Amino acid sequence: MLNELRYELGKTPSISSAVALKAVFPGCLLTLAVMPFSSIIAGWLFYLTGSLSVFYVATHLRTIIAAKRLLLIPLCLLAIGLTNLIWYHHYYQPDSLLPYVYNAYRTSAHAGILGAFILLTVLHISQKNRQQPLFYIIAICIFALGYAFYQSLFSGMHRIGLVFGTATSAAYFLTFIGALSAQALLKLNSTYKYYLYLGHFLLVTVAILLTETRAAIFVYPIVGATILLSEVRHSKPLFIKAFVGSSATLLLCLFLFQETIHQRVNDLINDVHSYSMNNSRTSVGARIAMYQSGIEAGEEALLGQSAEQRAERIVAQAEQKPNLAGAVEYLDVHLHNEVIDAFSLKGLPGAILLVLLYASLFYFSFFVLRSHLSAALLFALLMYGLSDVILYSRDMLIAWLMAFCLGTTLTGKWLKN
């Protein structure tokens, strides 16, 4: 009944419907395509797509509200975006010593609000008009991989970063577009699609290894293998071949990049050892220090506080506990954990809204759409949110949202009707 209602929404011809059908999906595709080369232009495309989606939602408000189960994720995104804006306008001062923190929350708030409307529009376009732009999605991944390998070979960069600058952001983007294009490959009507998938799996994994981002090196192989195995789970021979093929691909990557992986594992062990010796001025040690100090700072301001107040509390903690000193170096950015960063600045309301978003994504992925791709993207979002922030970063939030929106056209319960 829910799906039938959803599909009826796109049947009434109108200018706004035509705009949504002709512009929203191309807007999502163009945003993803341009992002690894220019995050500024990608942002403009996203804002244009979001503005068109606002127009569509405003002219279809009654029918959109009727499909209540499809409102959960957009409402949570909208609430988080509005909360971020309220926090920004309440605490920001022009002479702030931490402008990056405020600017990041402001821009991510805009992305979250417009993303909510884009997702609403995508979910309410009728099934027969939902585009499955397989070749465009695959092409986007090819261009992103080409740029990544170009940087590795000719730019002299130790860790590739695409246009984002930081290798971690590049790894996250490659994970999202890699998962999306992997599913697109599996939708092809070709006897060679599984071989193409394994080649794609190899190339994306290699590109992520070139970023040397530990979280992504762990997460993407799970995401990629899960998508493939979920697709062939009803055929035992195919499942066995897929398992062997994905395992062989990972073993090949381990062999080709054994020095890189060995070095990153050693760095992890050394960082943990340093933290045990009260030295938190390492990558892992600083994260542990940020988690502890962020929780303690949030507990002292359960209804929220400014970035300056949080910084003062964490500096005071570091003076009393030297093992928390590593957190001080990151006070002008974020605390490298989605929930803790939200809790430390927006208090319990901010943390609760974030948990509600995760819960709504879980409910939608497993009980509404029933999509293994949506579940894989949720897994990536959760795992990256443990040691970094995605919703706090405008570019990564946009990339994840566009991948999630386009992913609803590729797999799921209602595509089988």
Predicted features and spans:
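Transmembrane alpha-helices of multi-pass inner-membrane enzymes
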Residues: 377-384, 391-417
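Alpha-helical transmembrane segments of multi-pass inner-membrane proteins
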Residues: 28-29, 113-156, 165-233, 256
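Transmembrane signal-anchor hairpin modules in multi-pass inner-membrane enzymes, especially those
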Residues: 1-94, 121-131, 135, 184-192, ...
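Hydrophobic transmembrane alpha-helices and their immediate junctions
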Residues: 345-379
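Long extracytoplasmic/lumenal interhelical loops at the membrane interface
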Residues: 281-285, 289, 299-346
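Perimembrane helix-loop-helix junctions
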Residues: 54-61, 221-243
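A membrane-periplasm/extracellular boundary helix in multi-pass inner-membrane enzymes
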Residues: 231-277, 295-299
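Aromatic-anchored transmembrane helix interface
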Residues: 48-50, 70-84, 94-122, 135-142, ...
